[in-house]
């Protein structure tokens, strides 16, 4: 399937995948309901899809993959569903701790980790420590956990205000680059392509600052059914776009 990505455009130039792809992993519950299964079965299937798509992204040359795993609004779901999602994350992190170095996969977290269980926070910290010792050029998966775009911006504003109060920064110092350094995504390029499966046509509070010039790809495919061929179609659609960044094509 990688041949679909490593294709050529009308000028005959090879088309590489975007450097940074972000995905809103949506549709797990509906996937399960269509099959008469509990919603937790959909989340389990979605977790397997994440593993497969992350591996494929790494293999075709994507450097960063950011996924929306659990939003600040997802706490409104049933206690059983939240517990199941956190259990899947724990299992994934336990596996990742043992394989990250061998597979050359860096793992980073976006979001406010304060409400997360101490055990899960400790695992996330351990993966961060392992990632810090891996080469920066290695593939990196960013997992958005208890994340919301507005919350991220508010936390960044508070950190900047605290630095101003401490005399370390001045309000007039603030520009795009400085503000970006206070975000969860600091040091990571903005996503060129944001993908949302499941047929929904909204961002749902995902990467609100970082998506300023992202291209969007929406598909009716539910996340557990999202496969390498669908990702290839998303990347092909991305390459068909005329990205002008507010300018005029010469």
Q: Model segments located where?
A:
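Flexible, compositionally biased loop and terminal segments
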Residues: 1-250
């Amino acid at each position: 399937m990688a041949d679909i990505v490593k294709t050529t455009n009308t000028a005959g130039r090879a088309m590489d995948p975007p450097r940074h792809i972000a995905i809103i992993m949506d549709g797990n519950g509906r996937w399960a309901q269509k099959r008469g299964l509990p919603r937790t079965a959909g989340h389990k299937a979605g977790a397997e899809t994440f593993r497969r798509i992350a591996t494929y992204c790494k293999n075709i040359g994507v450097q960063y993959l950011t996924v929306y795993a659990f939003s600040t609004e997802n706490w409104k779901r049933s206690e059983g569903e939240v517990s199941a999602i956190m259990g899947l994350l724990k299992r994934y992190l336990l596996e990742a701790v043992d394989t990250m170095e061998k597979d050359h996969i860096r793992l980073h977290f976006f979001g406010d980790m304060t409400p997360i269980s101490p055990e899960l926070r400790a695992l996330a910290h351990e993966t961060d420590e392992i990632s810090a010792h891996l080469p920066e050029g290695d593939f990196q998966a960013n997992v958005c956990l208890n994340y919301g775009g507005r919350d991220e911006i508010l936390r960044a504003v508070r950190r900047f205000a605290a630095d101003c109060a401490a005399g370390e920064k001045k309000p007039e110092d603030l520009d795009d680059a400085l503000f970006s350094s206070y975000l969860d995504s600091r040091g990571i390029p903005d996503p060129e392509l944001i993908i949302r499966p499941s047929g929904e046509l909204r961002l749902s509070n995902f990467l609100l600052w970082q998506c300023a010039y992202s291209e969007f790809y929406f598909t009716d495919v539910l996340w557990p059914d999202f496969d390498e061929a669908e990702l290839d179609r998303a990347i092909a659609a991305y390459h068909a776009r005329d990205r002008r960044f507010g300018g005029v094509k010469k």
